[in-house]
């Protein structure tokens, strides 16, 4: 079974906002499957807008049903073709927060190059790094699979598909870098989710 959900430990009342129970054929794209020397890629829909003043990038509510189904089937297709082998959907933590969850569960160091991150026109770097896109994924890809990824995404002009970093051996940590140098964003001494590669 596949079980998932969202809850909030700080809520003044007991609530579960989303829950999922079902079966999948696989292969499963667990974030634990990332390996050292994998490349970190972002796949996200740039055709959208922020919802009101919230950090939510809405690329769904104005999209056609046909396009939504096309996007829905893309990641499973890439998994079945063994083009990507580990992934994590970009969640409320944005690109940077999701990278932390990815590194924590994979037990790897992730180095993100901020200057490689593509974003929609008119969106600031900070807003894009921290927003919750309705369609966005961080993916672990072997360098040898990159040509196949680019070919598979050729028909998706609305999607950002860019190499933004790398996985390395070492403690679970995330570094961000640009032309001015690199800085530590997070390391395992301060657990985020507590779901580590070891457990």
What spans do the regions from the language model cover?
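Active-site-proximal betaalpha loop/short-helix elements
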Residues: 64-134
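Short, compositionally biased
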Residues: 52-68
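Helix N-cap motif at beta-to-alpha junctions
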Residues: 140-147
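Short, surface-exposed beta-edge/turn micro-motifs
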Residues: 37-39, 134-137
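Glycine-rich anion-binding loops of enzyme active sites
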Residues: 1-52, 166-169, 177-179
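Flexible, glycine/charged-enriched surface loops at secondary-structure junctions
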Residues: 1-6, 83-90, 110-114, 158-167
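A structural signal for short secondary-structure junctions
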Residues: 104, 129-133, 145, 154-157, ...
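Acidic, Ser/Thr/Pro-rich beta/coil linker or hinge segments at domain junctions
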Residues: 155-199
